[in-house]
Regions:
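Extracytoplasmic "Venus flytrap"/periplasmic binding protein-like
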Residues: 26, 44-107, 142-145, 243-244, ...
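Long, aromatic- and glycine/proline-rich binding clefts that accommodate carbohydrate-like moieties
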Residues: 315-376, 404-420
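Glycine-centered hinge/linker elements that transmit conformational signals in sensory
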Residues: 159-165, 199-230
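Short, solvent-exposed loop/beta-turn-alpha elements that line the ligand-binding surface or hinge
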Residues: 100-107, 151, 174, 193-213, ...
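Hinge/lid segment of periplasmic solute-binding proteins
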Residues: 83-131, 159, 264-266
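Extracytoplasmic/periplasmic solute-binding protein
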Residues: 121-127, 132, 156-202
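A bilobed periplasmic-binding-protein/Venus flytrap-type ligand-binding module shared by bacterial periplasmic
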Residues: 134-139, 196, 279-293, 311
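Extracytoplasmic/periplasmic substrate-binding proteins
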Residues: 187, 214-295
Length: 420
């Protein structure tokens, strides 16, 4: 037994010392670009130019986090660079090195600030971004309310537009991803509620939230009833079941790529508190246990090069975090979405509402509260006030159980994010 242990220890030591003799491929440990085709594109199109090679591993959050925690606990590891959403990296800051030396020129200051994770160090560097947008068939534009600016719509104008479309065409032409695979919860968390309340969590049961849900009920009355089954809005846009839709950019792309002349993209509407939107920010970070710090820093800077940012866009449909010109041969969807994202993130009333964070394995239950609220109020016809009061208690209990502090646009909290 002793001999076996000694052999195992020797083998482990040999693995540990291997980089000293021949620099190993950099292990890029990521929650992003998980599908087989995206991981392959990352390896072959994005990372192939990195000297020494990269072993890109995209995986689910559970195993991703388990290995990170094991390496942090051991004080030694093999991961060169972490890739993850803002919420994935939040909470790991104690084990991450300062990346202030990275080449971050061209990244918006507000986006860069997110990477500090509440510290005075650059704990991650923004790597790529996506968001959700509105899309419309050009045929719908002639029915826009008088004086409405497509790039600066309000929710009231969207309701008026949807109503006009219904009347002009003899059926509802607004579509919404409210099916089982749809991202409806992100609309409520990142768009509707913050636009009316300036909050995702704290003001969940407020009078302003009541107004938001009443407005959405009015909007739903002008929405194609098949929306209760929609997952990816590019499909009903292409069949013209709907003429106007909201969805994640990755779920709208096919419509623009197949029929580039027929569709336009534009920012989400604004409510009384601003033009709320949910930026999906992915970042790269380096653990203090990285086996070769020079290699890790080189890979971080490689990910920020303009040509790498463009290659990442081609591979993942995530947009550059740097303000760089895009090549002429980009897909039609990219050409349409780029200006719309810029108009939304740069709007004078822009109100970023981050993805939920600090919830760990309870993220699904958090999302379910927003989905249940929608289903009870909008589909089930339950009174708004009664529903909000009941769901607010479920939300408060979940925040207390997870201990998750508030995230933007809610004000920072010392303990669990309060539900007033």
């Amino acid at each position: 037994m002793h001999r076996m242990l000694t052999a195992a220890a020797a083998a482990a030591l040999a693995l540990t010392l291997a980089p000293a003799t021949a620099r190993a491929e950099a292990l890029f440990w990521s929650t992003q670009a998980k599908p087989v085709e995206e991981s392959q594109a990352m390896r072959e199109q994005v990372l192939a130019g990195f000297e020494g090679g990269v072993d890109y591993q995209g995986m689910d959050n559970g195993p991703w986090l388990t290995r990170i925690q094991a390496e942090m606990q051991a004080g030694t590891g093999t991961i060169a660079v972490l890739g993850g959403l803002h919420g994935d990296l939040s909470g790991l800051e104690a084990g991450l090195v300062d990346l202030s030396g990275a080449d971050t020129a061209g990244i918006a200051p507000a986006t860069l600030e997110l990477g500090r994770l509440g510290t005075d160090e650059q704990k991650y560097v923004p790597w790529m971004q996506a968001t959700y947008l509105m899309a419309a068939n050009r045929k719908a534009l002639e029915h826009l309310p008088e004086g409405a600016d497509l790039n600066a719509l309000t929710y009231d104008q969207l309701i008026a537009w949807a109503t006009a479309l219904n009347e002009a065409t003899g059926g509802p032409k607004l579509g919404f991803p409210a099916g089982p695979q749809g991202l409806k919860h992100r609309f409520f968390q990142g768009f509707l509620l913050p636009a009316y309340t300036g909050s995702t969590v704290t003001q969940f049961r407020s009078a302003e939230a009541e107004t938001a849900w009443e407005a959405f009920k009015t909007l739903w009355a002008q929405t194609n009833p098949a929306s209760a089954n929609y997952g990816f809005m590019q499909e009903p846009l292409l069949t013209e079941e709907v003429w106007v839709a909201f969805d994640h950019v990755a779920r709208l792309g096919d419509a623009f790529n197949q029929r580039p002349d027929d569709f336009v993209a534009f920012p989400a509407p604004a409510g009384p508190k601003g033009r709320a939107f949910m930026p999906v920010i992915a970042g790269v970070a380096v653990m203090s246990t990285a086996p070769d710090m020079d290699q890790s820093m080189a890979l971080v800077n490689y990910m920020l090069k303009p040509e790498t940012q463009v290659a990442t866009l081609r591979a993942t449909n995530f947009f550059p975090v740097k303000d760089i010109p895009l090549p002429d041969d980009m897909p039609a969807s990219v050409k349409a979405f780029g200006p719309a994202i810029a108009a939304m993130t740069g709007a004078p009333d822009a109100l970023p509402a981050l993805l939920p964070m600090g919830l760990g394995e309870m993220g699904g239950q958090f999302n379910q509260i927003y989905t249940d609220t929608f289903e009870q109020i909008v589909l089930g016809g339950r009174p708004v006030r009664d529903t909000l009061d009941a769901q607010a208690e479920a939300l408060r209990a979940l925040m207390v159980e997870t201990g998750a502090p508030c995230w933007a646009p809610d004000a920072p909290s010392d303990g669990p994010c309060p539900v007033e």
